[in-house]
Amino acid sequence: MSYENYPETEQPKRKRPAKKITPQRLKNIGLYSLKRFESSVENLRLVLQKRVNQYAKENPEFNKQEAYQWVENVLTEFEKLHYLDDDRFTEIKVRHYLSIGKPARYIQNKLREKGIANAQITEMLEDLDYNPREMALKLAKRKKIGPFRSDEEARKLNRQKDMATLIRAGFDYDVVSEIMEIDFIADDKDDDL
């Protein structure tokens, strides 16, 4: 690429070449990622394979299959050291989503994206006593819709809109209509839901 047509101050940034992939580098990338974020085995596998693919794209002679084996070795080592634990990851994520009022469908989709099995997600939801009515109330409270609107007139005017919001969030129509029938709930009733 020629830079003659660019003034000195407007030259495009040159992309830095990817660093060489080695087993130790993959381990360091994995540790750095786990230091910042809890992860599932499958999710970390994707992160590490993405790095391998970036390096292989710039260096066609690089043996990707060997690097993929290094990735598997790193994952196995991290599991033995309990740095990676899908059960722990699932529990943390399910608890977080339940605390902010997310429906089961949303939780299942998000965790499936991270490589967690459906059976494991369902088991965790059952262990944590998932209650769709409670979750819908939490979401309604957070968004100040339905029974948490400030006055009765606003509730009547926005009933359909509020129902649509909860249904789009993933709650069943029966649960949503039940929530909409609840009388006004003042904001100071925090934990009585």
Pin down the residues of each PLM region.
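An alpha-helical, amphipathic repeat domain used for nucleic-acid recognition
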Residues: 1-193
